Amino acid sequence: IYLIQMGLDSEQSFTIMESVRKGKGLKEEWKEEMRAHDVPEWYIDSCLKIKYMFPKAHAAAYVMMAWRIAYCKVYYPLAYYAAYFSIRATGFNYEIMCQGRERLTYFQKDYERRKDSLSKKEQDVYRDMKIVQEMYARGFDFTPIDIYRAKPDRFQIIDGKLMPALNTIDGMGDNAAIAVAEAAKDGKFLSRDDFRQRTKATKTVIDLMGDLGLLGDMPESNQLS
């Protein structure tokens, strides 16, 4: 900005200061141009001595990172983990990660044994396992998914615990999760058949939800025996 104020071309001013910032100094033609615009010698000498300057944009980015990762992680931990899992976690798996720390540790050790041969999806799961382990280590826990309260793709803080999003159920994609959340707004599901018809969820996903205890005592069909 100073060089622009002194009358140098804006593009040339940027090029000069990028060179100075990286410790590459000044070309002779730049020095001549600066002197032609009455840039003082002390300024030119300073540009020749600078080895590195931290850009403002980088400084701002580090401050924002410190706010998110340091301050929020320490003082608003559940909000931090809810945001992280909702936005950053691409391999979060409800069955593996939300059934207690012991179960997670079992799967994590298995992944570690196969670390060099993990698929891309498994690598994402393994990365998210570490964050979940950190959360458990800090004394926080998950609450089971409530199909009437859970969001399609957002974790929630419920009674001091995290409720995972519907799309963390293995096999339930984003569209299916949205369909479940929308169908739940229309009232209680009378049976698994009713759930299947209203949400279009696959039998595999419904069976998994049943095994995980997410469907409660929901009967198989509406028919009375």
Language-model-detected regions and their locations in the chain:
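Noncatalytic, beta-rich nucleic-acid-contacting surfaces in large DNA/RNA-processing enzymes
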Residues: I1-S225
